[in-house]
A protein has these predicted regions:
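Intrinsic disorder/low-complexity detector
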Residues: 1-2, 85-101
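Short acidic/glycine-enriched loop/turn segments that link adjacent beta-strands
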Residues: 46-49
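Short, surface-exposed ligand-recognition loops at beta-strand->loop->(often short) alpha-helix junctions
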Residues: 11-21
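Short, structured motif recognition centered on aromatic/hydrophobic residues
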Residues: 3-8, 19, 30, 51-57
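Solvent-exposed residues in well-ordered beta-strands and their adjoining turns
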Residues: 10-12, 56-58, 97
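An amphipathic, aromatic/His-enriched active-site/gating alpha helix that lines ligand/cofactor pockets
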Residues: 21-38, 56-93
């Protein structure tokens, strides 16, 4: 069964540019590590501290294998460090979704 991972980020609204840099880096890193990146979104109008990302996988096992590759990837690890050092992500929630058919 295919799954989509929905990630909801609570952001520091004064560091949205840093989140945009972070999200842009995933555009190449996620596919390289085996994820199907559907996109990342950031605040435009209205609520100014919520960003999101969607990635699809063939199964939960495929997501777990991808996450292991992502943590071992040099660029992936660097992007995680960037987020930790800059502290623009205040919290992160993951929801695993399945399509309605």
């Amino acid at each position: 069964m295919s799954i989509t991972v929905f990630i909801r980020y609570q952001l520091d609204p004064f560091q949205c540019d840093a989140f945009e840099d972070y999200a842009r880096r995933w555009l190449t890193i996620i596919p390289k590590c085996g994820g199907n990146l559907l996109g990342s979104w950031m605040p435009h109008e209205g609520t100014n501290n919520i960003g999101s990302g969607l990635s699809a996988f063939d199964s939960l096992a495929a997501d777990e294998a991808y996450r292991a590759r992502l943590k071992a990837d040099r660029e992936g690890a660097a992007n995680f460090r960037f987020a930790q050092e800059q502290r623009f992500i205040l919290s992160e929630e993951r929801t695993f979704l399945r399509p309605v058919t």
